[in-house]
Every structure is written in structure tokens, then in C-alpha cells.
């Protein structure tokens, strides 16, 4: 089996798709968070021309047990055939559909410093299901500045823009002190999902899906694991 290496961040998580059958099953967040990883590896297999794979071989690639993989997928109906395994293309498509990636989403980025610029570039180049329709910054922006098809504007027009354009997702990369105000603004305007890349947790209504990406948390955990390795 080929060795697959990738640096793609597991970011494609849409927790509030409005699918009542999935909610009724009360599928754990841990399962949902593993699905993008499955999909990412399946995409690499598909690129290499692999047509089918067993849960055992998939476990070697991903690092989860074969039993865990089967259990996770069985939450959604299985998809495998005994004696055959999984169709790589079909499983990749089905997991994408479960995550909501059979649809497209309008997105705004709020905060256009270095992190906001990096995320705009990453999303536009790697995430075809997410269309950046507007970019906002707390500082005064020179008029008529654009990033590809998205105009770069000041936060004063954020609420009206989100409401008018029926934006689905807001990516927040503003300074931490302004994060809650920005979140409240976009929620009031109808946003249903927030990708929070600031250093603070947001206080939001329960019907708003939020994914907090605190980079320092990951870095600090890395340092712990480095020390743990040294003691072995």
C-alpha cells in the first residue's frame, strides 16, 4: 500500500447541516471529526488510481484500528461489502455528502491581517465548495481593493453585506478583543457557521455551529509530546 503524506488541515467540518436523521442518531463529535481525515486519505488513494481498499489497509494508512473505521462508517450505513472492502471513489463521495460537501457555501473572512490573507489564499486554492464573497477588516481599507472576486471592505458594512448576500460561514481572524463583537454581528445577520481562528472561545447561541481553531493549544500539546518522548 502506498505511503501517503499530506499537510492538509482537517478543517472541513460542518456540524449543523439540518439533517434530522443524523441528529436523531446523536452521532458523536469524535466520529464527525474523524470523517475529514478518512476523506482526505481516500482522495489521495483516488489520485493514485486505487479502486478499492479494505478497512485493514485503510487502518494502516490512517492510524485508526480497522474496527474503529468500520464502527464509524456503520453510523451512516456502512458502505463496504464483505470480501470486497470499500470502493474508494464511492466512499470518498459518500463521506463528502455526509459532511455537507456536496453543496457550496458562501463565506466571508473577517480580519485581513497576515492570518486572514493566508486563509483567503488557502481556501480559494484548496476548497472549491467554499466561495469567499467578501473580506472585512477593522482597519480602513483603500476603496476598490479586491481579492479575486471578493471585495475587501471595512467592518462597518459587515452586517448588511452578510444579510444581503445570505452568507453561510464567517471566518474570524480579528484580534481577540474584537472577536465576540464580530461573532455577534454576523450571527445577528443570519450566519449559521463560524470558523473561529482567534485565541478566545465565543459565547454563541446553541443553533450556531462553531469550530474553534486555537493554534497555541496545538503547539503547546506538541511541546508536551516532545518531552514525553524524551523520557521514554
Region spans (language model):
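Intrinsically disordered, Lys/Arg-rich N-terminal extensions and targeting peptides
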Residues: 1-16
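Extreme N-terminal segment that seeds HTH/winged-HTH DNA-binding domains in transcriptional regulators
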Residues: 12-51
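Phosphate-bearing ligand-interacting subdomains
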Residues: 38-46, 149-232
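HTH-adjacent hinge/linker in prokaryotic transcriptional regulators
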Residues: 52, 56, 61-104
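Glycine-rich Rossmann-fold phosphate-binding loop(s) that bind the pyrophosphate
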Residues: 112
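Hydrophobic/small residue at the entry helix of a nucleotide-binding pocket
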Residues: 115
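NAD(P)-binding Rossmann-fold cofactor-contacting core
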Residues: 126-148
